[in-house]
Amino acid sequence: VLEIFPSEYIHIGGDEAVYTRWEKCPDCQALMKRLGLKKTSELQGYLTNVVAEMMKKKGRTLIGWDEIIQRGKVNEQVVALSWHNPKDTLRATNTGHKAILTPASHMYLDFPEMSIPGEIQAATWCPPISLEKCYSMPVNDYSETSTTIGVQACYWSDQFIHGNALQEFVPLNENRSENYAEYLLFPRLMAVSEVGWIKQSKRNWEDFRTRVGSHFARLDNKGCHYRLPQPRIVKEDKNADGSVTFTLACDVPGADIRYTTNGRYPNVHSTKYTGPVTLANREDLRAITVVSGTRYSLPLYFAPDYSAYKAYGQHVFGWEPLRVQPKPANWRFEVTGKVSGNGTYELTVIPTRGDNPVRLGTMKLWKRKELMAETKADKTVKAGQQPVTYRFTLDQFEAGTPFHIELEGYAPQGNNTTGMIFLRKVE
């Protein structure tokens, strides 16, 4: 490995190690006793020391995820990639190690910028990371003794593995893979650059947002498939008659805003924004940034308010009459990111409108094509009645892996029914 890679740093990974085999291994247990270790996880620190000493003899420095300095004492100075929490860099400084800031909450660019309709397929095990959130990443230690040496943005290719929507289709020559990567990386990579070069006290989001706009023409000139920002709400006024007046702004110089006021998705031929717009219902406004006939943003969009159902967890699915069949059929919906780890979950089905009852059958949880949990049932639920809840347990969670649920649901008496489904982790 050292012959192939002449770099100063050698990365050994070291994150999310599983210690169950070590707990059962007599040799590992004997080693723990000989070294006086109390926790099996401390064996990782022992192994890190062995490799770090090997690297030192070869004139190299060990680098790995922050677990390498959290699982037992490491004697040689190493570099820890802090991906859990920005404050973890303090641990590196206090224990004689170096650190690189790369928290998943701000620097994992395989997450989408938003979770609005039409957003690109991307990682979902953490919330979206907007351009502003990326730019606002906190840096906790600017002291003279700080050993934080920089920032790192991570871009994982899991989504290429998990679905065929991103695979190249040669006859079309779409260059999907590069376009996909550029869409997620730009303009957020510009934010990463400033986080690395400018002290947090001198960062100014409004100033940065304005300056980024001047770079879109450069990206266009380079053929970069960057993500266009949606129109921005500058002002929202509530009028005496209950209507709402919006004032919008565009962050892309030379671009237009096109909008609709009926809740439908706008296109490049929709009404051009020239001044404040008044609507009876704020949720009916949709607006897009238009650069050309083929380059436009996702819509400015008001997400539904599910706060009244907070006790049931996160919204994962909704049905309307056209989706409901008179005979048994499976409703399939993604729960990647909503399923956040091993444990027990409850899936709650709540009809909200309609005269007809819904018949519910078996629920199945899938990890890719592998069945993880199955709950059999034969229940009927109707608007105004108690919701139906399925309980299941997951013990083979895998971060970054897609999960989906199939639920048998139908309405033999007619499809006049509308409802929602929520998922929560209970233990």
What are these regions (language model features)?
Residues V1-V78, W83-G96:
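Active-site neighborhood of glycoside hydrolase catalytic domains
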Residues L62-E67, V74-V78, H84-T245:
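Flexible, acidic glycine-rich loops studded with aromatic residues
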Residues R209-V316:
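Short, compositionally stereotyped local motifs that mark structural "simplifiers"
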Residues D256-T260, G361-W366, M420-F422:
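Beta-strand signatures of extracellular beta-sandwich domains
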Residues A280-D284, N342-T344, G400-P402:
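Extracellular Ig-like/FN3 beta-sandwich strand-entry sites
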Residues A308-V339, M372-T393:
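Extracellular carbohydrate recognition and processing domains
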Residues T348-D355, L407-G414:
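Short beta-strand-plus-loop segments that form exposed binding edges in beta-rich domains
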Residues D355-G361, N415-M420:
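Short coil-to-beta strand junction motifs in C2/discoidin
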